[in-house]
Amino acid sequence: MQTHEIRKRFLDHFVKAGHTEVPSASVILDDPNLLFVNAGMVQFVPFFLGQRTPPYATATSIQKCIRTPDIDEVGITTRHNTFFQMAGNFSFGDYFKRGAIELAWALLTNSVADGGYGLDPEKLWATVYLDDDEAAGLWREVAGLPADRIQRRGMADNYWSMGIPGPCGPSSEIYYDRGPDYGPEGGPVVNEDRYLEIWNLVFMQNERGEGTTKEDYEILGPLPRKNIDTGMGVERVALILQGVPNVYETDLLRPIIDLVAARAPRGYDQGNHADDVRYRIIADHSRTAAILIADGVSPGNDGRGYVLRRLLRRVIRSAKLLNIDTAIVGDLMATVRDAMGPSYPELASDSDRINRIAVAEETAFNRTLASGSRLFDEVAGATRSSGVSVVSGSDAFTLHDTYGFPIELTLEMASEAGLTVDEGGFRELMAQQRRRAKADAAARKHAHADLTAYRELVDAGPTEFTGFDELTSEARILGIFVDGKRVPVVAHGQAVDADRVELVLDRTPLYAESGGQIADVGTISGTGSGSSARAAVTDVQKIAKTLWLHRVNVESGEFVEGDGVVAAADAGWRKGATQGHSGTHMVHAALRQVLGPNAVQAGSLNRPGYLRFDFNWQGPLTEEQRGQIEEVTNQAVQADFAVHTFTEQLEKAKAMGAMALFGECYPDEVRVVEIGGPFSIELCGGTHVATSAQIGPVTILGESSIGSGVRRVEAYVGLDSFRHLAKERALMAGLASSLKVPSEEVPARVASLVERLKAAEKELERARLASVRAAAVNAAAGAERIGNVRLVAQRMSSEMTPADLRTLVGDIRGKLGSDPAVVALIAAPAGGESSTVPYVVAANQAAQGLGLGANELIKHLAAAVDGRGGGKADLAQGSGKKPAGIAAALEALRAEIARVG
């Protein structure tokens, strides 16, 4: 039975039983705590937790899942895969243990003619949690399993959770006995190769807390209702029904292995374990890579992008180790498409993009591999020569940091070479580099010589931010710092560098730079007896995420620790910043509406009148896409959507659909910004407008690449957008006036002028080349003879480029016949004594036979014009810095020819 048929039967079985079929979610979700979807129930978590009401009582799906913790084990055994399909049925307070067991047993054992899988009931076993007598009794009652085929296991095996806080519960697993060829008798507790787990029925009834292993977490209490979450391994059922020993022999992975075998000189399953591992790595990782790219992941250096990059690079290197020297990744992606396309149409519809991204990574990594492999061989040789078998952490770090060689690849190659790597030393050097980078960034940003100076204030409690409600606040000075050192008082004229003076207040309306929004500017003024004190706030930064540091320029009076002050944010600046920040949310929403949910935020910057938004995307946007994004954004602005901000528990906010940045750490309670209901909802601590119309027009300036798989959109907002459009309108009017055409005809007229200019430039180039050729004829005719050598040594016009000189010496040399001949040309610069002097020397074969090689003769030219040069015996070139020495250079050349020739 083919895999697509196994999938179809599963879904049909549960739909017939009243379940709603739900499509697979993407393997990436807007959850910063989850790298990839790793279970079928992930998209249903809000229903299990009672945070949202499910639109159906029961559901069924086949979820794409990715698990990469065991990536290094893939291929070594046939049990590990990074991608798998989890077929599941789910009940949200409807049926419980009996229903789950009855439905699973029926599908597994019903005949093929009746829509089942037709498995032999005598080969099926079940496990239950230690004290789950109810489940054990149901297996005996519903399935007729004898007691010796129902085994009890502890939390590590039969109590399920996602590995993070969330729903959990006891489980019951179904196993298939593959027979004595795969191991001894005794059931799953004895051998899980012979007894293969195919289905896990989770009785989801509790919520778990934090913990690092499968057994050390706390059960927080019962869920609002009892639920069912099951997961059947589609690939495992396929290997049973297809009668093959492992998943790599099934119809989804075997075609990839066959493709590789057709390209590799050594076949699969020929008794070479190392080669078989490489075949399996290619098969598994190619499939996972295609799925990831289809769901919007691009190769990168961290997070999901790094996992994809690592998968593709393991594929490429495994192919190299199989002696496949030609590009193969494109063919692999096509094979995955053909095998998986019937189940996942996006692999076919998005085939060109998937192929383009994967092949680009192959091309880039082949360059790294070529240079890095040579360097590793040198390191390995030096390691052995020193009498040790451990590649130093320093060498591994150099390979990684200087030459881009991944540590995982160094580890693999070292193992293959019989060496190990000081991975601890490598990690420490990486940590040191990160610490240096953070310290450098902090020094550049904060100019804090010693953060311990602020510790007392940090420990005393956070700064109260009042800026969401007011722009002016009364406050008290908690601390004054000059050049990072705490002082009791600071006065006008005491410090000339505004960035060296910092005031810490107990409360402030000035926004500290964070979340992409730059800091407010404003003033801090004294009160009472200190009313003459005034400081301009030029920047506000945070220390330890809780303490606001106001960088100031003291303009008058003095500030004393403990004094009362009035802090005020510049209203115009704040308005512009909020327009920019709200505009960023609008552009983000428009991007996802036009490009799809894979356009995930990677960074942003908002300042008055301007926004910059970085997002994960492969390849440039089309003009049509840019136009659509701009139009969707401005339509939302004109719709005058209400902007709501509120605080919510993190899990509830995510369940509402609030977007979070992957890799960002959030507190339990977060601030949510909602614009226009479902149009935009994000976790955000920034300041925002009250309604979307207050943003004003948004004009996208451009879109560009800022790294592999990351694009950047820049835009003007509000009045700056209007001013930009006004400038463009004036520019267009000026062009129309100069060209004497209506504005709408300017593009066509400019295009026409450009074509005419190109034609004129071509004509000029033809004339110049004709002049060069004529110069060659004239120069050859005027050749002088020194001994047996014919010599053309001339000073040429300043219009001659180095390329012209090379062409010319070749032409002249060809016209001088077979006698010994040398040509030396120097272009006289037009810019005076400070100009560069280019020169070229050519020598024919006969001259070289006399010892007059161009690479030697050029040294005599170079010395006289304070230059350098080099090349081969037939042609050499260089440049000097001393135009006054041109005549002497040519004479020096003549003297050398006279001496030798």
UniProtKB/Swiss-Prot annotation:
Keywords: Aminoacyl-tRNA synthetase, ATP-binding, Cytoplasm, Ligase, Metal-binding, Nucleotide-binding, Protein biosynthesis, RNA-binding, tRNA-binding, Zinc. One of its GO terms (molecular function) is zinc ion binding. It comes from the Bacteria. Its EC number is 6.1.1.7. Its main location: cytoplasm. GO terms for biological process: alanyl-tRNA aminoacylation. It is an enzyme of class 6 (ligase). It is found in: Cytoplasm. Binds 1 zinc ion per subunit. Zn(2+) binds at residues 581, 585, 684, 688. GO terms for cellular component: cytosol. This is Alanine--tRNA ligase. It comes from Mycobacterium ulcerans (strain Agy99).
